[in-house]
Amino acid sequence: MLKPALLYTQEITRKFTEHLYTTDYFYYCGYPCGNNLPKIEEKDDLYQYAIVDKNDDIVGFLTYRINDYSDTVHDFGLFSFDKGNPILGYDLFRKLEELIKKHHRIEWCVVSTNPVKRHYDKFCKRHNGYIHHWHETTKDEYGNYIDSYTYEIINRGRQQNENP
């Protein structure tokens, strides 16, 4: 279940701190040895959620921005504090479906080594989206250049699938 991250600011910060300098954090921030914790804050264009289970335990974090002028949803961030928990994927894709129906365009990025990439590929294809491949855009923690992908789904008024 998605709940406003402001309700869980201290717990989210603590959980992120435990994951600094890890490969999982690299997948979240896009560069190795990242040490900038996400700021949980109130801003008009910023949406931040704690992903919680039935016991109200935090299993993940989701953030994105909405540009009202272009009606574009962008700057997604997703982090799992409980690897393999299906609640995270379920809540993410339910939110993406909602955003696709409501807004003109959504976009997000992923590095090629992120295991969730294959799920993003399927989701984007199901919605007739575009996948842009960028070569050698960043280095991993071992200094190897890796590729990244940008996903783009444009709602041109077509009927969206109700039950993916």
Explain the meaning of each model-derived region.
Residues E107-K125:
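Conserved beta-strand-loop-alpha-helix junction that forms the acyl-donor binding cleft
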Residues F26-N85:
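Acetyl-CoA-dependent GNAT
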Residues L46, I146-T150:
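Short hydrophobic/aromatic beta-strand or adjacent loop that forms the aromatic wall/cage
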